[in-house]
Design a protein with these regions (language model features):
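Alpha-helical transmembrane segments in inner-membrane proteins
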Residues: 1-263
């Protein structure tokens, strides 16, 4: 047992060190050669020798670095939660069609809604409308998957159903592209080619806040998810409210998938 714990510490320590090294490499290395001492001066808030270097570090490398870290944490956490609930190591947001659902929500906003979400009470536009559309699309597919999981006992069949949902949403997106305007299709295609550099320094606080909220919910679910590893009946005997856990998982996974997809 002690040997196993030491092994885990070594693995986690190695991964943590690797993350730190990659963060440093991302900040100090790039297509533009910026001296290391200049990068340190920029990060400490001092004036750099060239104004363009300050722009590159703060507007490109730093947001890109934080976005990559948070996206990795969000996708791994959502995948772990789905694998635990469905008792299947292959379950994740892409295979179950949740990412496709988020993309469909964005397509409805950008291609059918003109980039805005309007109700009788409020109107959302810009990247906040994209986030809401992605969240609603991801949650809708996740609700459908959870409903199917109560009917389908085979995990393999459930994964196949998730793949089918993904193809259906992709077909609907293609249909929306066919009837949309050229400007709408262009905007959606540019968004669909997203990269870690798509989050600007101004958008980074909102992206970080939403991701951290989803991760905090995932942390709150650690104990009930550990109980679910032993089976739903055992978890219920331990006092775990499975329906409530699934609802929180629904919100956390939907939020994390929506944020990583929409930005």
């Amino acid at each position: 047992m002690i040997h196993s714990d030491k092994k885990h510490y070594v693995v986690f320590g190695t991964l943590a060190l690797l993350i730190v090294l990659l963060v440093v490499a991302n900040l100090f290395l790039g297509s533009v050669n910026i001296p290391a001492q200049e990068v340190l001066r920029i990060l400490s808030g001092e004036e750099a020798e060239k104004a363009s270097w300050t722009f590159i570090v703060w507007e490109s490398r730093f947001p890109q670095c934080i976005t990559a870290l948070l996206c990795g944490a969000a996708l791994s956490a959502s995948g772990l939660m789905l694998q635990t609930v469905f008792s299947n190591p292959l379950a994740d947001s892409s295979i179950l069609g949740i990412s496709s659902g988020a993309s469909l929500g964005v397509a409805l906003v950008m291609l059918a809604g003109g980039g805005t979400i309007t109700t009788g009470v409020f109107t959302l536009s810009g990247f906040f409308s994209v986030i809401l559309g992605a969240f609603l699309g991801a949650v809708a597919v996740l609700v459908l998957v959870l409903f199917l999981s109560s009917l389908i006992k085979s995990n393999v069949m459930l994964l196949i159903a998730g793949i089918m949902i993904g193809y259906i949403t992709s077909s609907l997106i293609s249909l929306l592209n066919f009837f949309a305007t050229a400007e709408g299709v262009h905007s959606y295609m540019v968004w669909g080619m997203g990269n870690f550099g798509g989050v600007s320094l101004e958008q980074l606080p909102a992206f970080s806040l939403l991701t951290v909220v989803g991760l905090l919910v995932a942390v709150m679910l650690i104990k009930p998810l550990n109980a679910l590893l032993l089976g739903p009946r055992y978890a219920e005997n331990l006092g775990v409210n499975i329906r409530r856990v699934r609802n929180f998982l629904l919100l956390a996974t939907g939020l994390l998938t929506a944020v990583t997809t929409s930005f």
